[in-house]
């Protein structure tokens, strides 16, 4: 199962394994929940009485609320093709659930900021969508005829034609729909709360298991905001001194006194470079012995290598977008 919304930097494929590696507790806190993969896995696990997800990104919290708590707010059957102008307007307005939905189904790499297609793809994708979704048969036929004329006129290569079959917007929308269906039918009684706010303003006292998945050092940050790594390390030290049970997903040790307790290797398919193994690590604010004494740790039964994750190449800028930034 893939957890969470389509979102840059998501832990969607390894979310269950991360939650399995956490101790059980009363109140679980994900301090920068992003696409909600960890909060969804934690809620479904039944290991906690309450799960709370914080994120500074208003639009992603709004979308998580609509798909994991307040169901029935999204019309999945009549979602239109979105132009670049409409995407930019929704991104800049950032007020309604439809604005939030457009940002994360119609953006490159689901980053919420950059339009999904370059100019040369937009006309084809729009015509393909119209050939399926327009209300009357005559309109659909005309869109299909226009699409075929464009193909003949522009003489696309086989690779370009194959690329057109990737239905990015529909795939993202379907993924969001699956999240809502899963959460709507869940059997766990765990209470889920989602809050828009900074991790530095969280009242940590009531939480007994705390998890951070910050932007990784050396990668592009999210939501066009610079992340304060120095302040973050100080926060980790404060929580550790308070005796809190704290975990951090990172590539390297996030702060002094944090110990690597698990690692997860996933194969990432980079269009220009082939498969690249990426190792993500889980750090605990204490020793390995202290970690092993925690209650509620699950046995990890899944294989160490994850299913391949496709990361797209942005032919507009000649950059490759990974799950943690542009390289």
Can you annotate each of these PLM segments?
Residues 1-27, 37-38:
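S-adenosyl-L-methionine
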Residues 18-21, 28-42, 53-58, 64, ...:
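Conserved proline-anchored active-site loop of SAM-dependent methyltransferases
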Residues 25-26, 48, 190-191, 206-207, ...:
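Short, well-ordered alpha-helix to beta-strand connector turns
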Residues 45, 202-206, 252-259:
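Short loop/helix-cap segments at secondary-structure boundaries that form the rim of catalytic
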Residues 45, 49-190:
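Class I S-adenosyl-L-methionine-dependent methyltransferase module
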Residues 165-177, 202-203, 214-223:
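Conserved binding-pocket/active-site segment within a compact domain
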Residues 193-195:
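General small-molecule cofactor/ligand-binding pocket signal
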Residues 217-218, 224-327:
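Long, positively charged, glycine-interspersed low-complexity recognition regions
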């Amino acid at each position: 199962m893939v957890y969470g919304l389509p979102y840059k930097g998501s832990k969607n494929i390894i979310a269950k394994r991360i939650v399995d590696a956490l101790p059980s507790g009363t109140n679980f806190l994900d301090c920068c929940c992003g696409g909600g993969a960890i909060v969804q896995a934690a809620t479904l696990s039944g290991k906690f009485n309450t799960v709370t997800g914080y994120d500074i990104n208003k639009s992603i919290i709004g979308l998580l609320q609509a798909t994991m708590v307040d169901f029935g707010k999204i019309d999945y059957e009549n979602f239109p093709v979105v132009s670049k102008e409409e995407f930019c307007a929704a991104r800049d307005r950032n007020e309604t659930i439809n604005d939030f939905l457009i940002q994360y189904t119609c953006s490159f790499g689901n980053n919420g900021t950059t339009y999904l297609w370059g100019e040369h793809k937009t006309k084809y994708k729009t015509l393909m969508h119209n050939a399926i979704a327009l209300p009357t048969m005559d309109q659909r036929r005309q869109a299909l005829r226009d699409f075929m004329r464009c193909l003949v006129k522009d003489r696309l290569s086989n690779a370009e034609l194959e690329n057109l079959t990737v239905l990015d917007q529909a795939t993202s929308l379907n993924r969001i729909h699956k999240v809502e269906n899963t959460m709507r039918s869940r059997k766990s009684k765990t209470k889920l709360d989602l809050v828009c706010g900074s991790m530095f303003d969280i009242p940590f006292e009531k939480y007994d298991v705390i998890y951070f998945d910050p932007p990784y050092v050396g990668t592009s940050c999210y939501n066009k905001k610079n992340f304060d790594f120095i302040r973050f390390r100080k926060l980790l030290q404060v929580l550790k001194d308070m005796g809190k049970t704290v975990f951090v997903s990172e590539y390297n040790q996030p702060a002094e006194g944090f110990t690597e307790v698990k690692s997860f290797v996933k194969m990432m398919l980079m269009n220009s470079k082939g498969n690249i193994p990426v190792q993500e690590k889980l750090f605990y604010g204490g020793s390995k012995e202290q970690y092993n004494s925690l209650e509620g740790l699950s046995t990890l039964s899944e294989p160490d290598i994850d299913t391949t994750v496709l990361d797209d190449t942005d032919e507009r800028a000649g950059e490759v977008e990974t799950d943690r930034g542009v390289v």
